[in-house]
Amino acid sequence: MKYSAVLVAALAAIADATIPIPKGGVPGQPIQESGKGAVFSGGTNNQLDLQNPSNIGGQPATDNGLVPNMKWSFSLSKTRMLYGGWIREQVIQDLPTSHDIAGAQVHLIKGGIRQMHWHRVAEWAYIYAGSFLISAVTEDGQFQLDKLGVGDMYYFPKGAAHSLQGLEDENEILLIFDDGDFDRVGTTFMVADWISHTPKDVLAKNFGVPPSTFDKTYNPDLALINSTISTKTVEGGNGALTGNSSYTFHISNAPEIQVPGGGGTIQVVDSKNFPVSKTIACAVVRLKPGGMRELHWHPTAEEWLYFHSGNARATVYIGGGLARTFDFTAGDAGVFPDNSGHYIENTSETEELIYLELYKADRVADVSLSQWLALTPSDIAAAAINVPIEVIEQIKKEKQYIVS
């Protein structure tokens, strides 16, 4: 008997109350454990239904009201395919709730180059596959030339001139921009695009070369190109960017923090240890199976999330009795509104969850619900949430970050 026939038979039996409804509802169907709901009888995407149980039968009873979508899968993004690799984005047109941040995945083959360019916004990056040669120049003629590997990051301030080159067979990077409307005209400026739209006699005068030098300039402009790995170094100008001025950050400078609550680790990279990163702050979070980022909120900005591996569930409380639960998997992005309350839980029994928290801010900051209750007079806190004082008195006063 085919799976669909078995499912139909099982659902019919459930409808007749001949067998109990599974805990958490019927997988892939809008049927809750309580008996609420019914089967899908029309068109539906079964794979998406199975990946998002919190939208159907698995939604908690505590969810309430109309809460906008806060999730986007990069698999739904249009992929721009080029000879040097590919690019796919999440911008505000994809996820209208993401005002502060836009994201992109960029893949470069060995020798592939992300063309020389600059932006009207800042660009931050996290490398999760391969390695890259990073090149940048400031308005003062200082330069950066650095090789970055998995876990390393960079930050280019608004207007900084830069380029990337892939150094291994396959290289992939997450780019973050501090404006959700990243595709707006006047955001990205490509050097080859500019040159191809400048009269050749002007170019000749500017660079002191014959006009024919620019006969083969790329037109239309290519964001990625094939090339060979650079063997050149850079000298002169006003010297290299180093120390607190460096645009690059090696993750070895941010050891994993074994948090008090157990259940995982956090690595924080913000302006405290990466001084140039003034508008993007990051936490790399690893949750063990069953681990949970404790109930908290962020006082400084929206939280933009990138899920690198594993599976997660999060409930977002946006005030006024409104709350919604979302399911996340590898390749998903999410955004939680400024100051909204939430948690993130690893729903796997065997696999570690790895995700990035990103903020349009100079530092990572959160307020722990548990710590707030514990550091409030216990009788007041107990009255506020209608629990015995003993419950408040046993809550740890130290921020736990992650619990298991």
Curated annotation (Swiss-Prot):
Organism domain of life: Eukaryota
Residue sites binding Mn(2+) 2 per the record: 296, 298, 303, 342
Localization of this protein: Secreted
Primary location group: secreted
Glycosylation sites: 226, 244, 346
Pfam family, one: Cupin_1
E.C. no: 4.1.1.2
Keyword flag Cytoplasm: no
InterPro entries noted in UniProt: Bicupin_oxalate_deCO2ase/Oxase (IPR017774), Cupin_1 (IPR006045), GPI/OXD (IPR051610), RmlC-like_jellyroll (IPR014710), RmlC_Cupin_sf (IPR011051)
Domain spans labelled Cupin type-1: 74-215, 249-393
Cofactor: Mn(2+)
Binding positions (Mn(2+) 1): 117, 119, 123, 162
Active site: 357 (proton donor)
GO BP field: oxalate metabolic process
A GO molecular-function annotation: oxalate decarboxylase activity
Catalytic activity: oxalate + H(+) = formate + CO2
Keyword Transcription: no
Cofactor binding: number and manner: Binds 2 manganese ions per subunit.
Main function: Converts oxalate to formate and CO(2) in an O(2)-dependent reaction. Can also catalyze minor side reactions: oxalate oxidation to produce H(2)O(2), and oxalate-dependent, H(2)O(2)-independent dye oxidations.
Name of the protein this chain belongs to: Probable oxalate decarboxylase ARB_04859
